[in-house]
Amino acid sequence: MNIKNFSVELEFAVNDKPAKLVLESRSAIEGYEDENLKLVCLVDDSCDTHTLRIIVTSKKPLKMKSAQIVHDHFFGKREQFFANGYQSWTTSREYKRGDTQYGLRGPSKLPFARKIAGVSGDYHFTVYGRELFHSFTYTYLRNDSKVELFGSLNERTGYTIFYADMKTNVFVITKDVEGLTIDGEYELFNTVHTIGTYDAVFDRYFEAYPLKHTGRVDHFAGYTSWYNYFQNIDEKIILRDLEGLKRAGDAANIFQIDDGYETYVGDWDLDTKKFPNGMASIVDKIHAAGYKAGLWLAPFAAEFKANIVKEHPEWLIKNEKGKNQFSGIAWNGFYALDIEQQEVRDYIKAYFDKVFDDWGFDMVKLDFLYAACINPRNGKTRGQLMCEAMDFLRECCRDKIILGCGVPLGPSFGIVDACRISCDVELSFKERYYTKVTNQEIISAKMAMNNSIFRRHLNGRIMANDPDVFFLRDDGMKPAKFTMEQKKLLAKINHMFGSVLFVSDDIGAYDDEKMQILLDSYKEFDGKVISAEYVSHDEIEIVYEKDGKRHTLKFNTLTGANSEK
């Protein structure tokens, strides 16, 4: 694609009067000025990584409605468009002509259900349609081994969303400018473009990206409590499973306590009935076993029942009607704290200080972070709100390890050390009925493996990828309904594509076979993935090299049936 062949289209209002500006590439590159604004377009195609920046300087306040760069592009029959989903959990994969990128489905499209099902995704500010695909922050077009990447270098001015309209054969780069008024100089777009092999284009993209991989986490292997007990944890369970993890020896290096230790999400008081000896004593035992200690938090969330909701309703983000912004269905519903207020920032920082200084944790898993930017507010776009929220979390966490989750990925680049790149894994390998009637963030073993494979390019370049857990147990408080073949497949995919490898099982109850699978899965993958793609509607084929030999793994995403040669 010729990056110098495009049009720039802006829609805005000046003094409440609608206006539109359309410039062909030549006019944009030469520079444009009128009574409302000055536009500068800077294009550099002198090296392998091309850059395009568009800067608008307003002469009067411009209330933005839309901003986009439009390229004509004929999409070939075999050409693949990669769609990076809105946040950690959102389905991310390649699409071609005839495919469908699903949004909300079935009953979830109804007004009341849409409010609930759609809040964690992009359904209220993006467009879904037949042979219309979109991607956040970056994307690529792939023809066999040739890959053409487009990526944003700045999400602070608004999310950059790439659309491939295969019906009309246009490729569009848009900026989510909802809520933005430009009053002065504003960088609307800052993008890169490069062509090469899959690995080469991502190497170049993250070389150009202004923030870098923190380097604090290369490989985590260990335990998290959530997927066996959910909120039903206590000191006895945690210490028993810590003892069980010791069977893994030096193969493990992290033990994480998940949701369930607190009285209410948002209050963050320790439930002393469950943990009568406090958290510091447990952290001491984790450290004595040779592991880093991790703790789950949802720092922007306040469940409906939390005391903070009753005592400080003014601390909550409000919607356009002045009501508390509904932010998700977890814990029977929760609101979001407004970190634009200094009192809220002080409150959140205080419990991070407790987690690190009083309790002694080394790592925090920070979840449901999308709640910071569901709607634009205070003249800031969603992208700006999310980037500033991530900056604040890094400030709170100092040099401690952050594992991000439920977070838009672009704003997390260079801030988090590791990040969930998939939805939660369902306790059943077979997909539940609700996966077909709700959003694209729903729990699913199938889509967790899908995302692990198709977001592999992030792993080690900008973060350590967390593909979510794998299961080996046969029983437990919440048995996993997987066959042994399905368990081994999930473990293998996580091992090949992830760098954060967790189970929630009581490892002390494993037999010798399960113990060996665990130890093999905990190791760093010492092979190289050559390619991975859907070869039919429900089959993925992975080609990789290991020990000097080329291997092909093919598996059915619905049944887990697989073969390798």
Name each model feature, range by range:
Residues 1-253:
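Carbohydrate-recognition beta-sandwich/jelly-roll modules
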Residues 219-223, 227-353, 359-378:
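Aromatic-lined carbohydrate-binding/catalytic grooves of carbohydrate-active enzymes
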Residues 225-227, 256, 291-304, 386-419, ...:
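Aromatic-lined carbohydrate-recognition surfaces of secreted/lumenal glycan-active proteins
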Residues 229-233, 262-265, 300-305, 371-375, ...:
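Flexible loop/turn segments at secondary-structure boundaries
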Residues 310-346, 394-509:
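Glycan-recognition surfaces
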Residues 376-383, 416-417:
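Short glycine/threonine-rich loop-to-helix capping motif typified by GTGT followed
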Residues 488-490, 494-502, 533-565:
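Carbohydrate-binding surface patches
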Residues 518-530:
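Amphipathic alpha-helical
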